[in-house]
Amino acid sequence: MSMNEQMNHAEENILHTYNRFPVMFDHGEGCYLYDTEGKKYLDFAAGIAVNSLGYHYPGYDEALKSQIDKLTHISNLYYNEPMSEAGEKLVKASGLSKAFFTNSGTEAIEGALKAARKYAYTKYGKEAGKYEIIAMNHSFHGRSMGALSVTGTEHYREPFLSLIHI
């Protein structure tokens, strides 16, 4: 399918949530992406947000293939060895006491907002009124109502006002 045919096909079938760049990628290697014409691009976005894994690093593909043969995804309502092992590594590397796993960056932002509010509530009590969250201007944190509430870019926020008071 040509680039123009692919663009038209996508516009017909996919909800327009972002302005897309007129490039169609075919594959990646390391930190590079290649379009359908073979042009090489340095992937400054490193994939996308929470999935900044690069492309085909030694050992990475093999580890994914091995895990896919066992479990591709399982809810955190159940125990599984890879999650426990990853949690242990994160705790040791971060110095924190627990790891928190989510399925997306938006869930991570929502979890962080809730953790900050719960911390303030537990430490200072409801009456202290410590519920405000500091956010950066010109930021983007996701499309959920909580994430939009701390997004500092007005054109993302405006269509969904009034947001959650942060």
Where are these regions (language model features)?
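Active-site-adjacent loop/helix segments that line or gate small-molecule/cofactor pockets in enzymes
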Residues: M1-E29
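Active-site and channel-lining beta-strand-loop segments
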Residues: V23-D43
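Glycine-rich loop-to-alpha-helix module at the N-terminal edge of alpha/beta enzyme cores
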Residues: K40-K126
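Conserved A3 ("GATE") glycine/threonine-rich loop of ANL adenylate-forming enzymes
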Residues: T106-E107, F140-M145
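Short acidic, glycine/serine/threonine-rich loops at helix termini
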Residues: L113-K114, R143-S149
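Conserved PLP-anchoring active-site segment centered on the Schiff-base-forming lysine
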Residues: Y119-H141, S149
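A glycine-rich helix N-cap at a beta->alpha junction
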Residues: P159-F160
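Conserved small/polar residues in nucleotide/adenosyl-binding loops
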Residues: I164-I166
